[in-house]
Amino acid sequence: MPKLKTRKAAAKRFKVTGTGKFMRRRAFRNHLLDHKSSKLKRHLGTKAVVDERDSENVSLMLPYS
């Protein structure tokens, strides 16, 4: 059986935790930041856990994680 290919776009966007969960970046922090509060921008800088309903799709894209 051939090796499974990793989707490189997904590999750059998601990281796996020690417990097997996937971490992702938050949206809304690329531009148009003037009107957003410092607290919001700081919160958007943290990582978020991928929802368990989406984790299955992410794990299919990253077969060796």
Swiss-Prot record:
GO cellular component, one term: cytosolic large ribosomal subunit
InterPro entries: Ribosomal_bL35, Ribosomal_bL35-like, Ribosomal_bL35_CS, Ribosomal_bL35_sf
GO BP field: translation
Alphabetic keyword roster: Ribonucleoprotein, Ribosomal protein
Domain of life, source organism: Bacteria
A Pfam family annotated for this UniProt entry: Ribosomal_L35p
A Gene Ontology molecular function term of the record: structural constituent of ribosome
NCBIfam families: rpmI_bact
Classification via HAMAP family: Ribosomal_bL35 (MF_00514)
Family: Belongs to the bacterial ribosomal protein bL35 family.
PANTHER family: 54S RIBOSOMAL PROTEIN BL35M, LARGE RIBOSOMAL SUBUNIT PROTEIN BL35M
Stated name of the protein: Large ribosomal subunit protein bL35
Natural source organism: Prochlorococcus marinus (strain SARG / CCMP1375 / SS120)
